[in-house]
Design a protein with these regions (language model features):
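Active-site loop of classical SDR/Rossmann-like NAD(P)-dependent oxidoreductases
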Residues: 309-323, 339
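N-terminal Rossmann-like dinucleotide-binding module
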Residues: 17-68, 326
Length: 358
């Protein structure tokens, strides 16, 4: 089917799918902290996206968002009732608010991008999934480390079977988060709003592990709070051992008690046909690759980590997240959601099962 549309003085025939591709996707960002501003910046840079609103409970003047000449709202309800045309709400608020705000946006007809984690409990994550299905809206979970060249490469290696059977996987996450991060009056470190170290700092790497090797079982864990007493309501370190449902065994060693700056986020894989270690501060470089009948290709450089002044985060790949949202909602036939709501829910499930052993 083709439609007649007028462009200037000309009337042309076009396909409805083409009209959808030409339409800019309208984004509203709720939560204008470090990561919310990153979302706003990436939306304005994408040629297929348009930033139409910002929202935060703090006064606009305190947020450093002068570059964005769009309407500003002090609550999600006020935003959703404003009459502004919105295709996507980007939820960049404290972790404990993600699920409820995502559901509220979906119920009013918006698609949603949820920063990690999508929820702090499996029950709340399931409610987001239910709302997405009930109202037929897409929910995109932000796990931007999937876009880093080493992640793309190792995913292809695992899925192609080149590594053979997976024997052992060791995930190490050693970062610094101290009083420069856990500030008085902030939500970081709060049990209800933050949720814990695995949710806030290391869910990206648990997502990569799940993406590559699937679910885990037979979990054993030990936890410690070495130097965050009075700063957080939870552990700063842990040792976790488990089996993979698909075969093989794994471990996770993590800590935010590292002095002064991040040390590493790495994954070591021992498999039937070889071994690989991906390392760096946020799994941004292949440090070791020795695989049967295989020569390691040169990979594109990974984007640098998000820079928050005294502390650093994961790779600056939010541009890929926004591009994926635009292409999916514009009807690109070859595009699928990079991290869908079911995968986001699975990461919450894994972390909840680990924390249940405290």
């Amino acid at each position: 089917m083709r439609l007649r549309v007028r462009r200037g003085d000309k009337e042309i025939l076009t396909h409805p799918h083409r009209m959808l591709m030409d339409k800019k996707i309208k984004f509203a960002v709720i939560g204008c902290g470090h990561i919310g501003k990153r979302h706003a910046e990436m939306v304005t840079r994408d040629p297929g996206a348009e930033l139409v609103a910002l929202c935060d409970i703090r006064p606009r003047e305190e947020l450093g968002i002068e570059a964005y000449d769009v309407p500003f709202f002090s609550s999600l309800m006020e935003l959703l009732q404003s009459g502004i045309s919105i295709d996507v709400v980007n939820v960049c608020t404290p972790n404990g608010l993600h699920a409820a705000m995502a559901i509220q946006a979906v119920e009013t007809g918006c698609n949603v991008v949820i920063e990690k984690p999508m929820a702090l409990t499996l029950a709340d994550a399931e409610k987001v999934v239910y709302a997405s299905l009930k109202y037929r809206k897409q929910v995109f979970c932000v796990m931007q480390n999937r876009y880093s060249p080493p992640s793309v490469w190792i995913k292809e290696m695992v899925d192609s079977g080149r590594l053979g059977k997976i024997y052992m996987v060791q995930l190490n996450c050693y970062w610094n988060r101290d009083e420069r991060y856990y500030k008085p009056g902030g939500w970081h470190g709060d049990a209800a709003l933050d949720g814990g170290t695995l949710f806030t700092q290391f869910s990206h790497f648990i997502d990569i592990m799940y993406w590559l090797f699937g679910d885990i079982c037979n979990i054993q864990a030990r936890f410690a709070d070495f130097n965050h007493a009075g700063l957080t309501a939870f552990e700063d370190s842990g040792l976790v051992n488990f089996n993979f449902v698909n075969g093989g065994m794994g471990s996770l060693s993590y800590s935010t008690s590292v002095w002064n700056r991040n040390m590493e986020s790495s994954m070591l894989i021992v498999a039937e046909n070889g071994s690989v270690k991906i390392g760096g501060q946020y799994m941004n470089e292949v440090e070791y690759c020795h695989i049967k009948d295989y020569e390691m290709p040169e990979l594109a450089p990974t984007n640098p980590g998000n820079d928050y002044g005294p502390y650093k985060g994961s790779a600056q790949n939010h541009n890929f997240v926004i591009r994926n949202v635009v292409r999916v909602l514009s009807g690109a036939s070859s595009e699928c959601i990079t991290t869908n709501v079911l995968e986001g829910m699975k990461v919450v499930d894994i972390i909840q099962r680990i924390y249940a052993l405290k």
